[in-house]
Amino acid sequence: MTQTLSQLENSGAFIERHIGPDAAQQQEMLNAVGAQSLNALTGQIVPKDIQLATPPQVGAPATEYAALAELKAIASRNKRFTSYIGMGYTAVQLPPVILRNMLENPGWYTAYTPYQPEVSQGRLEALLNFQQVTLDLTGLDMASASLLDEATAAAEAMAMAKRVSKLKNANRFFVASDVHPQTLDVVRTRAETFGFEVIVDDAQKVLDHQDVFGVLLQQVGTTGEIHDYTALISELKSRKIVVSVAADIMALVLLTAPGKQGADIVFGSAQRFGVPMGYGGPHAAFFAAKDEYKRSMPGRIIGVSKDAAGNTALRMAMQTREQHIRREKANSNICTSQVLLANIASLYAVYHGPVGLKRIANRIHRLTDILAAGLQQKGLKLRHAHYFDTLCVEVADKAGVLARAEAAEINLRSDILNAVGITLDETTTRENVMQLFSVLLGDNHGLDIDTLDKDVAHDSRSIQAAMLRDDEILTHPVFNRYHSETEMMRYMHSLERKDLALNQAMIPLGSCTMKLNAAAEMIPITWPEFAELHPFCPPEQAEGYQQMIAQLADWLVKLTGYDAVCMQPNSGAQGEYAGLLAIRHYHESRNEGHRDICLIPASAHGTNPASAHMAGMQVVVVACDKNGNIDLTDLRAKAEQAGDNLSCIMVTYPSTHGVYEETIREVCEVVHQFGGQVYLDGANMNAQVGITSPGFIGADVSHLNLHKTFCIPHGGGGPGMGPIGVKAHLAPFVPGHSVVQIEGMLTRQGAVSAAPFGSASILPISWMYIRMMGAEGLKKASQVAILNANYIASRLQDAFPVLYTGRDGRVAHECILDIRPLKEETGISELDIAKRLIDYGFHAPTMSFPVAGTLMVEPTESESKVELDRFIDAMLAIRAEIDQVKAGVWPLEDNPLVNAPHIQSELVAEWAHPYSREVAVFPAGVADKYWPTVKRLDDVYGDRNLFCSCVPISEYQ
């Protein structure tokens, strides 16, 4: 045997698991595109002056088992104290049926945002359920699904309040002094760029302040007090002030709906509906508003529509509000939200139903009453008489209480003057309450739970009578039917079957990087060492998290060529916002705050101009030339015109046109010459890793889509993570946090998300990916992504012209297929092709972005040659079908393309089409059939007849 022990150990085994084509397939594809090797292909495509001489030093690869063991050892450094800190985060009991069938199920977590509703009806239904939960609990008319976290939702509520306010000259936003501190932090950050003045005061003093356009109240204050704001809201409404209320989703089960009290906007975190704390996230926020404000709402809204056969079908409604269409005029820059977490919360509500939720909420409140009664019986004073689950307990010996708590492995809230905060949750037991008595009173307290229970059961006044909910919630059958595990399992499976995810087929969406989310990468996110930590626990309890985050940040620094990485942003769009704020604050530190012009190429993703607008910048569009590259002449002219007001350029690399622009360094130099900064959008980082880097190219800041390049799954529309990498001069200006000091970050800036490290519990996914791939594997992944894209382009270019290419006719990691000539000749559109691909078992490529009338295809490195060939064969077969239409064999108004997708029920219905049933549903090469459950959606009907709550179950059948 000639192999060495090192070869037999095969530490790089995962590289071959992650990359789809094996060595033989890679060589076949290289031959097809006319390249001798991966290195030769890369050398032809990537400009020589930006190619790295040596790959970033992120270590050797590790096997799945070795990496899991290494990460488990790191995770074990976290200390799992029982946390009663509260502040918007509590421990939960995620029902195992949801854990196994959703959170751990690639049929749910590998799906994409439901832009293609025909292959997304399952998660759209779950999201509609989420909206129904929100509507029932808030008492409002319109809900979205969903936002990034509660603090971000507060900032969105402020922005929305200004949009809808009739007080156009008012510029002040009032925040009640007992909102959560992290919420206030994010609101202040957003207000600064919008030029709003934030006033923080006792809610009852709001009327003392003039020129207020909006008010933020918190129904259950951060230290636990329940407020009856009915009269105050009425007075504010009489003065035309827009009222937003932050609410606790579990408290709303028992408390009066803020919408019934007159609130215009209600929002909060859905975390305690089954989603672990995860050291801060990911968690979905709910958001609701009055019907009259629906077109000013941020985020996705799921609406009920009809398909081509008149059947009920769901879709994302009113998309003209959103960044991918309205760009800088959008209501928000939100793209990725928190769909997977919203769906967990919605299914938590389905599983427990109204009776179960009331039992949980009442049990939490009863235990809180028992704790309060015992403490008061022993002479301790509560700061608030009215509470749901949180007590603010005044203590004489605070240091002693905290010391006893630490000894008992308990976290209390400690930042309240002369008091401690205690928040109970659904995991709290009577034994926990007895332990809390010992911490606060000493071991010889003599209290008995059952005796206290009898007392409070007959005389609880901790919720005001006027604040008790008097209406029914969750009356729709979906919340009253699936309470056995068998029924719940089958319901979830019925939803999953309606959707197309990566566990069934390639999702070739350009600019989305739908690559493998390996099982080994996903396993650690449910480890209790990661899942159960409170984001505001003492840092010494989170040493495992700190080590993992620091190591991941170090790897990302090396891979990007930057000097520092900030992990706080919760999505790519939020990363853009954070990076632009860093640029803004950098200019201000140099007394150049007047620099507010952001140059953006015409091809940019819609989040770019939307984020620039949010950061207080003016957007100036830079033209692209006929080859899709940034027009340098126009860039110089626009930069010179901006002059001393130039803030930055936002550029994507490789470009959204799917090519490595030869002049990217010159672009950076022009902007720097005029005093601007270069923001390089990290959306296409999958074509850079190991080959080049933003820092090496000359950029100053980038966000990284960890849910693209670094394998966090898309979850059907979230979660995501968008950390930013920065050069040293921008490092002091990345987001900070008002509650937690971020180690190693010397920043004085406000936060952009509620938790200091964003959605920290999904960072292990990216850690595992980098650890298992190593430097060698990461570079190879980028190279194979490029190879796969060029293979598709070369095989399809005769049937569907590739719109933009670089040197030697090559593309980067994605290609744009131009459908416009075919449409002119035949009337068949890119939409028809996209829908016909469903019949062939594929999700559509990205439609009409960045160029109308095109399809953008990104195969990623994870797809094998077999799957690529299946996609290519499907596209060629569709081209042959188009030729049949062109030849007059099938009429334009009745052919397999314009009628696509076809559903099962059509097979047994009367058939009057000029093509066979077999052509319709089993076109050439289709063996493993995916069946959509609805035909093509009627978008116009959906927006003209907006309906965004649950419909009768019979409508889905």
From Swiss-Prot:
GO terms for cellular component: cytosol; glycine cleavage complex. The modification N6-(pyridoxal phosphate)lysine is found at residue 708. GO terms for biological process: glycine decarboxylation via glycine cleavage system. SUPFAM superfamilies: PLP-dependent transferases. Disulfide bonds: none annotated. It comes from the Bacteria. One of its GO terms (molecular function) is glycine dehydrogenase (decarboxylating) activity. Its cofactor is pyridoxal 5'-phosphate. The glycine cleavage system is composed of four proteins: P, T, L and H. NCBIfam families: gcvP, PRK04366.1. This is Glycine dehydrogenase (decarboxylating). It comes from Escherichia coli O127:H6 (strain E2348/69 / EPEC). The lineage of its organism: Bacteria, Pseudomonadati, Pseudomonadota, Gammaproteobacteria, Enterobacterales.
